[in-house]
């Protein structure tokens, strides 16, 4: 099942958290959920050139805090903050709450799965060869510290008559390991021949903070100087 399910959804509550962080009663829940979906769709459409990775929505008391993670924060903010005021007004039309906008810069867009997928989609729309686009993305991600990456491209690649799926993988991408930090992103390239789907998995290493077995092992290694040498020495002294 790890091969089929969305890796982010599988890890929610383990090493990932939700993009919508609020609580509502059953009367309000549906309304707020639809608000979130409308806000995200509008912002993604408005900020198409800003390389938006994700949008986090939090709702403290009578407020709506929207945090935009972008690789190009300057495009979001605009000259002297003009564009951010437009975004605030756009979001304010969709919700009754007071709107707060935060911008967070994505430092390494090459290892953000959503941004990698969007980049490949844009290249396919510009008629760049799909193999070259995939290979370039894989090399950039591995160079910037990813432990593994897998990219799937499916559709009428290169204008072929029959749709097919092509994929590249480098390093390891453990989809079943729940403590693995696996980022996942998708995008659609609307080419002259039809739509092509892009899926990207990026493995950034294992998160061991919440793993009691890993913590016990780490403590044992610190106590014994990082190996079994001390134990062997004690056994020899006792003999």
UniProtKB/Swiss-Prot annotation:
GO molecular function, one term: rRNA binding
SMART domains xref list: KH
A Pfam match: KH_2
A cellular component annotation (GO) from this entry: cytosolic small ribosomal subunit
Gene Ontology biological process: translation
InterPro entries on file: KH_dom, KH_dom-like_a/b, KH_dom_type_2, KH_sf_prok-type, Ribosomal_S3_C_sf, Ribosomal_uS3_bac-typ, Ribosomal_uS3_C, Ribosomal_uS3_CS
Keyword line: Ribonucleoprotein, Ribosomal protein, RNA-binding, rRNA-binding
Annotated KH type-2 domain residues: 39-107
Residue segments, region Disordered: 214-239
Quaternary context: Part of the 30S ribosomal subunit. Forms a tight complex with proteins S10 and S14.
Family as reported in the entry's similarity comment: Belongs to the universal ribosomal protein uS3 family.
Function of the molecule: Binds the lower part of the 30S subunit head. Binds mRNA in the 70S ribosome, positioning it for translation.
Protein name per its UniProtKB record: Small ribosomal subunit protein uS3
Organism: Methylocella silvestris (strain DSM 15510 / CIP 108128 / LMG 27833 / NCIMB 13906 / BL2)
């Amino acid at each position: 099942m790890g091969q089929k399910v969305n890796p982010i959804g599988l890890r929610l509550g383990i090493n990932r958290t939700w993009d919508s962080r609020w609580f509502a009663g059953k009367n309000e829940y549906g309304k707020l959920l639809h608000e979130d979906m409308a806000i995200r769709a509008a912002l993604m459409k408005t900020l198409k050139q800003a390389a938006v990775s994700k949008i986090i929505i939090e709702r403290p008391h009578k407020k709506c805090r929207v945090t935009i993670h972008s690789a190009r924060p300057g495009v979001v903010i605009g000259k002297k903050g003009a564009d951010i005021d437009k975004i605030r007004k756009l979001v304010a039309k969709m919700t009754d709450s007071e709107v707060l906008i935060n911008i967070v810069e994505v430092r390494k867009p090459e290892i953000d799965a959503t941004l990698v997928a969007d980049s490949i989609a844009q290249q396919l729309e510009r008629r760049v060869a799909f193999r070259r686009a995939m290979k370039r993305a894989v090399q950039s991600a591995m160079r910037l510290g990813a432990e593994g990456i897998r990219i799937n491209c499916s559709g009428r690649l290169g204008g072929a008559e029959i749709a097919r799926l092509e994929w590249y993988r480098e390093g390891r991408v453990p989809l079943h390991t729940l403590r693995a930090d696996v980022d996942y992103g998708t995008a659609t390239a609307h080419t002259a021949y039809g739509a092509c789907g892009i899926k990207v998995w990026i493995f950034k290493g294992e998160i061991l903070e919440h793993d009691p077995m890993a913590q016990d092992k780490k403590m044992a290694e610190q106590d014994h100087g990082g190996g079994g040498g001390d134990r062997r020495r004690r056994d020899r002294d006792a003999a």
